[in-house]
């Protein structure tokens, strides 16, 4: 079965979802509709040329209200009300909600009213039927999960790591700091913002702010609910982020054991989700890396046998966009 998906919101994540599908060559998913309030030609241009990820790897043709990237015409609309979208006409299996605006179950469920069989939100979504981190809990998807959250890029980085470590050595409590590239909701110059930290110029500051990513791990791993917390430090890089995770293990462990646990999982049941490196790499080396999380082995530290610090990189755009497709395909198997 080839799952038919639509994308509402053709921004950083929306465009990268389409690009990831085309670059992967996978044939189990196809984009049949895009809704974005920008002009079709502008959306096509931003798809062709990308400052972070480079030129689109295929031709991008515009014909009236369609974009074609080699898999047939994709219908493009500019409809404000999600209930009025053409998902029934396009026979959409999974509507991908990528605007950042309709990030609650009630708001996202308007895609169901428009004819989509399921909805996948590219952000944490209050009230979602299930929050999924692919590779960690996607097996829990059932036909009753109509509105699903794909969590956040940071939760997708931390959750696989937390799962395997908790399974092997146990986590009493842990604290995460994500050193995170700036994103589209941050200004280029100081301006008004509901978060006064994020009101400051993105490219000129290191900005401490909040994140619910660590607590959200408890939504996908109930055994860790209430045991994790975290903060975010937004930094002046345009892409790639890193999770610095410190925790108290429930039993004594070592650097070697922690690294072996991660390496084994990355070569086994978390292959293509969790990667690892023992090279002296920096953030730009992980640009366009499709893993949810890439563990940096030579950064592991253990103090007094049970206080552990680990570091894991993630391309906060590309890895997450690849997981959106993976999760959509998993959802389609429940329809």
Describe these PLM feature segments.
Residues 156, 252-253, 318-319:
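A generic structural signal for alpha-helix starts
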Residues 100, 153, 209, 250, ...:
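Structured loop/turn residues at secondary-structure junctions
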Residues 4-6, 147-149, 243-249, 308-314:
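Short glycine-rich or small-residue beta-strand-to-loop segments that form or flank ligand, phosphate
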Residues 290-335:
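NAD(P)-dependent Rossmann-like dehydrogenase/reductase catalytic/cofactor-binding core
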């Amino acid at each position: 079965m080839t799952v038919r998906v639509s994308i509402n919101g053709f921004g950083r994540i929306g465009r990268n979802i389409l690009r990831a599908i085309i670059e992967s060559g996978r044939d189990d998913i196809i984009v049949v509709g895009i809704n974005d309030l920008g002009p079709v030609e502008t959306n096509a241009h931003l798809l062709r040329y990308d400052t972070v990820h480079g030129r689109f790897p295929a031709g991008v043709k515009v014909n009236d209200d369609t974009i074609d990237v080699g898999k047939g015409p994709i219908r493009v609309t500019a409809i404000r009300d999600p209930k009025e979208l053409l998902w029934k006409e396009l026979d959409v299996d999974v509507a991908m909600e990528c605007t950042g605006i309709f990030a609650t179950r009630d708001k996202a469920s308007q895609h169901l009213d428009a004819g989509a069989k399921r909805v996948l939100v590219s952000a944490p979504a209050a009230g979602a039927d299930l929050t999924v981190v692919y590779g960690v809990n996607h097996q829990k998807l059932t036909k009753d999960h109509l509105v699903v959250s794909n969590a956040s890029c940071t939760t997708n980085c931390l959750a696989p790591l937390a799962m395997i470590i908790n399974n092997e050595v146990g986590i009493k409590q842990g604290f995460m700091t994500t050193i995170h590239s700036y994103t589209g909701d941050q200004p280029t110059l100081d301006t008004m913002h509901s978060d006064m930290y994020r009101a400051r110029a993105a490219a000129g500051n290191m900005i401490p702010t909040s994140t619910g990513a660590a607590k959200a791990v408890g939504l996908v791993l109930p055994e860790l609910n209430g045991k994790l917390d975290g903060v975010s430090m937004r930094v002046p890089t345009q892409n790639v982020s890193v999770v610095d995770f410190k925790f108290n293990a429930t039993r004594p462990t070592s650097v070697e054991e922690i690294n072996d646990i991660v390496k084994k999982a990355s070569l086994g049941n978390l292959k293509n989700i969790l990667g690892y490196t023992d090279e002296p790499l920096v953030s730009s080396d992980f640009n366009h890396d499709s893993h949810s999380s890439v563990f940096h082995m030579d950064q592991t530290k253990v103090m007094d046998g049970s206080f552990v610090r680990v570091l894991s990189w993630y391309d906060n755009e590309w890895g997450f966009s690849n997981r959106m497709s993976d999760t959509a395909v998993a959802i389609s198997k429940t329809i």
